[in-house]
Design a protein with these regions (language model features):
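Glycine- and acidic-residue-enriched helix-capping/strand-helix junction motifs
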Residues: 12-27
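Short, surface-exposed beta-strand segments enriched in small/polar/acidic residues
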Residues: 2-15
Length: 188
């Protein structure tokens, strides 16, 4: 399994005046990795420290590891008023069945959290006919999980006080996908 902690180094990602997306998502990625490894899944991370890794290298890491799937975590700051945005999943515009299954399994597990879910979407929030680089170039099932608005205290709980629960639910969704896809021996 390949887990992508986005941004890193001088690329901070979103910033709400207090928190950096790069830091929050590395922490979540580490927690998801630990959950998966506890279940016997081999995990490769695109970054494990606060370093910059370009998108080409991220894809190379996942593809070279022969990972069964790729999941990348992100945050948003679309609404500075703090209105909750909730969680969304993004897959390739062609809606490949394996990516749709992966994203759906994760979103189903996250259904129990106290934020809204906007389901599995294709493309990007700004352009439904354009793909995120990772979804466009991944050779395996892939999805981007957007974990809410950084200005929303409700959404922020997902990656602060509730991070362990969020990581467990995401890992459970990934495990469900891996089992359904035939990776029951805990590999990849």
């Amino acid at each position: 399994m390949c887990i992508d902690a986005p941004h890193g180094g001088s690329d901070t990602g979103q910033y709400d005046g207090t928190n950096y997306e790069k830091t929050q998502m590395l922490s979540l990625a580490d927690s998801v990795k630990n959950e998966l490894e506890s279940a016997g899944v081999t995990v490769v991370m695109t970054r494990t420290t606060d370093t910059s890794v370009d998108y080409t290298k991220r894809i190379e890491i996942c593809n070279n590891a022969k990972a069964a799937a790729l999941v990348s975590f992100h945050r948003d700051i679309t609404d500075k008023s703090g209105s909750s945005k909730g969680i969304s999943a993004w897959i390739h515009t062609s809606s490949p069945s394996n990516s749709k299954s992966l994203a759906s399994d994760i979103m189903e597990e996250l259904n129990g959290v106290d934020v809204s879910l906007s389901g599995v979407n294709t493309g990007t929030p700004d352009n439904k006919s354009k793909d995120y680089y990772l979804n466009q170039h991944s050779k395996v099932a892939s999805c981007i999980i957007e974990l809410g608005n950084m200005y929303s205290s409700k959404d922020n709980k997902l990656v602060t006080t509730d991070i362990d629960n969020t990581a467990k639910l995401i890992a459970d969704g990934i495990m469900k996908y891996l089992e359904q896809a035939g990776y029951t021996n805990g590999s990849n």
